[in-house]
């Protein structure tokens, strides 16, 4: 295939990737302090690329769509007006179940740092 044919194929694949991405929005459970388990699901807006589950003290739970780059203790605590909490952010459909593993902010930061270091050394 000539360079023109390769360029056209790359262009078509790029358009297809964009169209496929536009057709799917993340789904998350969406409840605040449900009486039982949360079963209400919603489609997240285009700028919300994560689901979040929060357990706050005194007992209060949140299930929501969220922005992954805002998944940190300080932002969540300030935004939800909760001082003591555990949270889990995830990026798959309906992944914010109450039985999901809860990560503290420090654990999430450690995992991110290890991933960045591994990626850096592999390049």
Curated annotation (Swiss-Prot):
It comes from the Eukaryota. Residues 99-123 form a propeptide. Residues 26-103 form the UPAR/Ly6 domain. Pfam families: CD59. Interacts with T-cell surface antigen CD2. GO terms for molecular function: complement binding. This is CD59 glycoprotein. Expressed in all tissues tested (lung, testis liver, kidney, spleen, heart and skeletal muscle). Highest levels in lung and spleen, lowest levels in liver and skeletal muscle. SUPFAM superfamilies: Snake toxin-like. Keywords: Cell membrane, Disulfide bond, Glycoprotein, GPI-anchor, Lipoprotein, Membrane, Secreted, Signal. Residues 1-25 form the signal peptide. It comes from Sus scrofa (Pig). SMART domains: LU. Disulfide bonds join 28-51, 31-38, 44-65, 71-89, 90-95. It is a lipid-anchor; GPI-anchor. One of its GO terms (biological process) is innate immune response. CDD domains: TFP_LU_ECD_CD59. The gene is CD59. It is found in: Cell membrane; Secreted. A lipid is attached at residue 98 (GPI-anchor amidated serine). N- and O-glycosylated. Glycans are attached at residue 43. One of its GO terms (cellular component) is side of membrane. Potent inhibitor of the complement membrane attack complex (MAC) action, which protects self-cells from damage during complement activation. Acts by binding to the beta-haipins of C8 (C8A and C8B) components of the assembling MAC, forming an intermolecular beta-sheet that prevents incorporation of the multiple copies of C9 required for complete formation of the osmolytic pore.
